[in-house]
């Protein structure tokens, strides 16, 4: 049996509309155990780094398995999430990139830009993303280990 994911979702005000739609899909997905929303709400203007870092920290702390983050471009939340030790986040707006995000890079965080892709594509990509699981015995595992090794060096 495949493990279900504990997913955290978040956005800034530029991604709020998509976050709400995507959250509903995640909550009904059979690959999802739970969904935690770290903001924002309809009236908030929380800066995207706060939301992205909170979501990424939940993964780093073992409280979530994956995060889906949305801002205007998807780039700001990816950069912010990547500042949390142990997190690999990337923006992906096509099926192949979503697949490789997990299978080649073991990234836990997928980010979207509400101003970049349509909602139907975002829904499709989020659903696909939940079907992928990183294989620790794959050829990519050594490359991911090198990233982790560098991250853990005393600098």
Predicted regions and their residues:
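C-terminal binding/interaction regions
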Residues: 3-17, 95-155
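Short, conserved beta-strand edge motifs with alternating hydrophobic and charged residues
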Residues: 10, 35-38, 67-71
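Short, solvent-exposed amphipathic alpha-helices that sit
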Residues: 17-28
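A short beta-strand-loop structural module common to alpha/beta enzyme folds
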Residues: 33-45
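Helix-adjacent hinge/juxtasegments
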Residues: 51-91
